[in-house]
Amino acid sequence: MTEEATGRAGDCESGDAIPASRVAGCTVGEAKTVIQRGLWFEEFEIGTTYLHRPGRTVTEADNVLFTTLTMNTQSLHLDAAWAAEQPGFRGERLVNSMFTLSTMVGLSVAQLTLGTIVANLGFSEVSFPKPVFHGDTLYAETVCTDKRESKSRPGEGIVSLAHTARNQHGDVVARAQRTTLVQKRPQR
């Protein structure tokens, strides 16, 4: 989603400091600015599937860096010789499933929540039906399953999302239900 603004010169020339999140929504002279952003609460549609592209090809460096940064020293992620001897691993190390989960959610950010999310409220029903290996490309899709206005936080709403990640063959490699707190469209 993009944010467009129209107006006349002076719209952005106030002597007051303008938050960086608002600068791109203004007009300078006759020029229109457009900012990439996620969806406001009102723009989420229950039942709509959002396809997130482009995909993300996972490298060995991604897996090793993520695994060591998060202190997960499982041999199945780090030890190539050990993994080569394990049945069902194709002779390869598995990509850390937390990297897969993080990437699945990350692929959705630009389209759904960039600059509009207040908080992740929780994840549930997380599963990894198939493993991810170095060289696999992940694609994500999200279905908005529910939304409601926040009772305790005016100007915000709760949006429930069902994320799915697939590899380059279309195999489902991850699923998760996610609940988020999202800003409503600002009142002007």
Task: Label each region the model flagged.
Residues 1-46, 128-137, 141-188:
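HotDog/MaoC-like acyl-thioester-processing domains
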